[in-house]
């Protein structure tokens, strides 16, 4: 038997945002219903970064994403994040595919934001604010475009050049957009934060009633993007409670005792599955705390793999003498 090898370029050609959103939504639902396995992430920590092992089993596949985070890599001509996915058959354990997962990590994160807003934002949301205009902002925008009729985008980034580039991207797609201060960008229907900040970049007084926030940036202990006062008055929905408590947007507030895990309303999977309510009024502030789950990675890898087989894309290698 042979294992399919898929490069980043090939992976990018094999899955759309629509496919990713469908896969991620179903993954969240299955996990909430107890129909998926996902052990905790395993970390190897080094002086200049870390490696993380992220395993999961769902939808007839098992998979492991092996991903690094080395902030100093750009100085060496390497990406900060590089990821591989090994996709296995649960029946035999055979490695069906080894593929790039760098692109799909960004894609599934964006997809999760779109799905969360679908269930938690006001249906008539039209003004979208972005705090942080790096790569992930584009994936968030593309997912949100598939759920809402976006009338206006307000963009803020500490690097004005990045904000201007994002605004141009929006305008090229027929969306009215402008560079704004963080305070003005926060005054919107849906706010997306994608920064690596360790101190709040969004103040409580900036956020109006009825706002939905996709809090994407916090991905480790000590990171936070939102004033804890926002968390205290919002309906908080997480992708996974344990991961969110460890390194999501709520981690600082929970560790300081400002809020407790009992203040988390639900997981997004529980909302999708109908086990918990989503938005219940036009006045409440809702927050989606996204940490990124292995179930998302396996769900999108399934789509990539099956599309590759049907389109005869990729190369094959025989690892074992069998």
Curated annotation (Swiss-Prot):
Any one Pfam family match given in the protein's UniProt record, by short name: OCD_Mu_crystall
Superkingdom assignment: Archaea
Catalyses which reaction(s): L-alanine + NAD(+) + H2O = pyruvate + NH4(+) + NADH + H(+)
Binding locations of NAD(+): 108, 135-136, 157-159, 217-219, 223, 290
GO cellular component: cytoplasm
Active-site residue numbers: 65 (proton donor/acceptor)
Disulfide bonds listed in the record: none
GO MF term list: alanine dehydrogenase activity; NAD binding; protein homodimerization activity
Field pH dependence: Optimum pH is about 7.0 for both the deamination and amination reactions.
One biological process term in Gene Ontology: alanine metabolic process
Family affiliation: Belongs to the ornithine cyclodeaminase/mu-crystallin family. Archaeal alanine dehydrogenase subfamily.
Matches recorded under HAMAP family: AlaDH_arch
Protein name: Alanine dehydrogenase
Originating species: Archaeoglobus fulgidus (strain ATCC 49558 / DSM 4304 / JCM 9628 / NBRC 100126 / VC-16)
